């Protein structure tokens, strides 16, 4: 009888365990920021007035912004040119900082896994190391890994205002 009880307990334990999968959630933008979990509260995607496509996520004073030529389903390599780049900003007063990738600085990739023009959403993964714009700052690089953005709303027929990045 004990064997049956143990078997049923083990079976119940195995059946009740589930893995977390970001695709089971609605809309998400998250990553490990220097190995600490970071999840955006606000996110959006769309085309700026200069024609560049952007994906953005923000949490309080932190903002991540990706710039890609188009929302095509492919992998964009960072650190090669200024057309494709990742920017991280902290806008907290007194602790302002900006890190970015670009021609010959930083590295990483943005992989667009789905661009749904019918539902106006974009999904993908990312990882990057960005360089501080202030060469005299104590912290010179910031690292994002295991990044995912899922079903981020794409604003159709509305251009974002171009910012200086």
Predicted regions mapped to residue ranges:
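Residue-level signal for mature regions of secreted extracellular proteins and peptides
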Residues: 10-11
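Bacterial signal peptide processing site
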Residues: 18-21
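Sec-dependent signal peptide recognition
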Residues: 2-7
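C-terminal motif of bacterial Sec signal peptides marking the signal peptidase cleavage site
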Residues: 14-16
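Surface-exposed helix/loop patches within compact recognition domains
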Residues: 29, 33, 37-41, 45-121, ...
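Acidic, metal-coordinating catalytic segment for phosphate/diphosphate chemistry
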Residues: 26
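C-terminal or internal capping secondary-structure element at the end of a domain, subdomain, or sheet
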Residues: 115-165
